[in-house]
Amino acid sequence: MAPDRALAAQARPEQEFFCFRVGDLRLGVPSENVLEVLRAGLLTPLPRTPSFIMGVTGHRGEVLPVLDLLRFLSKGEARIGPRTRLFVGVTGSYVAGVVADTVLGLRRIPVADILPPPLGGDAAAEHLLGVVQASGNQEAINLLNFSKLLQTARQRAVAR
């Protein structure tokens, strides 16, 4: 990298996000919250759990709860098909699988390009870190506060 480019990159801090699509939503979570991506296999439904918990699956000898972000955010319902993926997300001691229709990959986003979340009381807005606006052929990405999302999901599941 040329010295001028290196200085410009240092002057503009970036954050890396794991980006994916579920339903009509294009979402990103901080890459440090993602352990790995798996094919969505068979899920075992659990009785008397919130509707956003699709079930559990076995992963590396552990039972992994699988979350439907569309239901959690009141934006519809995810479907599991042959191309569906799960990403294993973690924050603190909480680990969960999350349904993704399409994995878009890792994206480095300049911190200055992250806009604050929109004001509003819906479930999606309260779990956002911010939004990256559309540019060129890139669509807007809603950046999730994954730590808050998993904590809220756990609280809702335990409260039932």
Curated annotation (Swiss-Prot):
Residue span(s) of domain CheW-like: 14-155
Keywords, comma-separated and alphabetical: Chemotaxis, Transducer
Cellular compartments per GO CC: cytosol
GO biological process: chemotaxis; signal transduction
Superkingdom assignment: Bacteria
Pfam families listed in its UniProt record: CheW
Functional summary from the UniProt entry: Necessary for proper aggregation of cells to form fruiting bodies. FRZ genes define a system of signal transduction analogous to the enterobacterial chemotaxis systems.
Protein name per its UniProtKB record: Protein FrzA
Lineage: Bacteria, Pseudomonadati, Myxococcota, Myxococcia, Myxococcales
Gene this protein is translated from: frzA
